A protein has these predicted regions:
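Active-site HxH/HxHxD metal-binding segment of metal-dependent hydrolases
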Residues: 44-139
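Metallo-beta-lactamase
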Residues: 36-39, 44-46, 125, 131-132, ...
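Residues that act as N-cap/strand-start positions at coil-to-secondary-structure junctions
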Residues: 1-2, 23-25, 126-128, 134, ...
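Conserved beta-strand hairpin/beta-sheet module of binuclear metal-dependent hydrolase folds
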Residues: 3-55, 161-171
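Structural signal for conserved beta-strand scaffold positions within catalytic alpha/beta enzyme cores
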Residues: 9, 16, 65, 83-84, ...
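Short Pro/Gly-enriched beta-strand edge/turn motifs at strand-loop
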Residues: 9-15, 118-122, 143-145
Length: 171
């Protein structure tokens, strides 16, 4: 398994996938239902999070995004189905608000043991068209597992939390 990521099992079908080796210490969450799995955020994009996800589930994956900041969308490039809040569609598809050089500086500002295949000169901020737009109150059904979208703007215009009432989990 890729040593860049740390996987912690929260319950039988919920996993935290973390990047503890970087100062940002980003966390993504994999929730497996009966029909599909949801990956909440994809981290920094320093290493391929898809390889880790594929060791945990064979279900189809929908990526849902808490917000469009570089440390939450870096691994979006490894997935086909991405959902974001409607207020951040343009940030994802065309107008990311932070220049690439600022992001690269933030990525490298503190020393860490990057994977050998990571090259900062090739690092890009993910840009793409989301396959689904999220709205406050939307329900995402994974098959015997359901998330409710809660729009929580402030950190960014389209910031969202995701609530799973049956387990009382808030992501």
């Amino acid at each position: 398994m890729d040593s860049w990521f740390t996987v912690e099992q929260i319950d039988c079908n919920t996993f935290a996938i973390s990047e503890y080796k970087h100062w940002e210490e980003t966390h993504s969450y994999l929730l497996c239902g009966e029909k599909m799995a949801v990956l909440i955020d994809t981290g920094l994009g320093i290493s391929n999070i898809r390889k880790i996800v594929d060791t945990l589930t064979q279900l189809p994956i929908m990526v849902i995004t808490t917000h469009i900041h570089w440390d939450h969308i870096g691994g979006h490039k490894y997935f086909k189905f991405i959902a974001v809040h409607e207020a951040e569609r343009e940030w994802l598809s065309a107008k990311f608000p932070i220049p690439l050089q600022v992001v690269k500086h933030s990525l490298m500002c503190k020393p860490c043991n990057f994977p050998l295949d990571f090259n900062i000169d090739q690092y890009q901020i993910f840009q793409g068209v989301p396959q689904m737009l999220l709205h406050d109150g939307d329900s995402i059904d994974l098959g015997k597992r359901k998330l409710i979208v809660i729009h929580t703007p402030g950190h960014s215009p389209g910031h969202c939390c995701f609530y799973e009432a049956d387990r009382k989990y808030l992501y």
